[in-house]
């Protein structure tokens, strides 16, 4: 599948990247373009190859073939301090104090002691964990520990940030707080964010672009709004009062009736497919001669819908090819 090109400069470019572990192909010719200062969703079922791709970008492993460019240069270990990484498998040293451990990680990233302490205290206050600086890590709740690890991932102001399931385990209030910070990092600091998640509501809210990987291959790629529009494919939701048979007869040969649900009192909710050659205004003129249209709007398509359809189609194609 071709990579979607974007007019914005690229933060990350993968070209035909492959990775094999024994007989298992983790990535099979994956190409991606991640625009600068964007939130790019990396999606896929468990075992699809997302973690392998993330580990490559984080510098933990390398591809067997293909290339990875980081802000226009070949990705090397020299770029490690320009990347922030929040792994799905969290881990803090339980026998250290919270502030001591945060300082340790900040210093590893090359920050001076003075700057690290100032930046950390600002973040601790922002995420409302400032009262925990001198507490033991073992005293932290799961949510508190996740906040600390988020801070550690972003403290050195990386220009590229990898977030693997960053909202997992948060209550709704703190999940909203972290989402707000992710958006702020993009908008105020120009941070490019690679977001790996199964939470499609977060994808809807946060992501500018997404790529979907399944069985080690990219099966979907593009701006979120365009993928939703493509998945909608001219479908509209319509509610009317009248005779369903008369309504169906009034559709003509162009429109397609996908589903119909009778609600009682002669009211029906239907999903229709209209080709681009039939404007919705023209269509409504046809049907209003037969029924009373109560509401009509383009069908709402979420990224959850897009994800499920793409994975289903990909799996069906794989079965056909096997």
For each feature predicted by the language model, list its residue ranges:
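C-terminal coupling/interaction segments
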Residues: 2-3, 275-322
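ABC transporter nucleotide-binding domain
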Residues: 180-274
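Primarily ABC-family ATPase nucleotide-binding module
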Residues: 2-10
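Non-catalytic surface loops within mature trypsin-like serine protease
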Residues: 36, 131, 242, 274-276, ...
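Short, surface-exposed acidic/glycine-rich loop or hinge patches that mediate macromolecular interfaces
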Residues: 73, 218, 241, 274-277, ...
């Amino acid at each position: 599948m071709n990579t979607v090109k974007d007019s914005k400069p690229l933060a990350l470019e993968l070209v035909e990247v492959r990775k094999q572990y024994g007989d298992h192909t983790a990535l099979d010719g994956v190409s991606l373009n991640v625009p600068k200062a964007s939130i790019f969703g990396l999606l896929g079922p468990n075992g699809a190859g997302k973690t392998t791709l993330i580990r490559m970008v984080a510098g933990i492993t390398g591809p067997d073939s293909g290339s990875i460019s980081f802000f226009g240069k070949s990705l090397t270990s020299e770029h490690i301090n320009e990347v922030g990484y929040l792994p799905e498998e969290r881990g803090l040293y339980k026998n250290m104090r919270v502030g001591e451990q945060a300082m340790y990680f900040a210093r590893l990233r090359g920050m001076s002691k003075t700057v690290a302490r100032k930046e950390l205290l600002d973040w601790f206050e922002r995420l409302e964990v400032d009262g925990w600086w001198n507490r033991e890590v073992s005293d932290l709740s799961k949510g508190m520990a996740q906040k600390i690890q988020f801070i550690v991932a972003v403290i050195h102001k990386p220009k590229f940030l990898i977030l693997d399931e960053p909202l997992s385990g948060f209550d709704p209030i703190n999940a909203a707080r972290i989402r707000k910070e992710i958006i702020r990092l993009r908008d105020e600091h120009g941070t490019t964010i690679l977001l790996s998640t199964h939470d499609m509501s977060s994808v809807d809210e946060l992501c500018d672009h997404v790529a979907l990987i399944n069985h080690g291959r990219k099966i979907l790629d593009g701006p979120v709004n365009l993928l939703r529009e493509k998945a909608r494919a001219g479908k509209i939701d319509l509610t009317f009062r009248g005779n369903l048979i008369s309504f169906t007869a009034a559709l003509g040969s162009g429109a397609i009736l996908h589903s119909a649900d009778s609600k009682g009192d002669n009211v029906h909710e239907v999903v229709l497919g209209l080709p681009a050659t039939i404007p919705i205004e023209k269509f409504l003129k046809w049907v209003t001669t037969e029924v009373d249209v109560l509401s009509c709007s383009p069908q709402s398509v979420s990224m959850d819908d897009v994800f499920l359809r793409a994975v289903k189609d990909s799996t069906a194609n794989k079965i056909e090819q096997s």
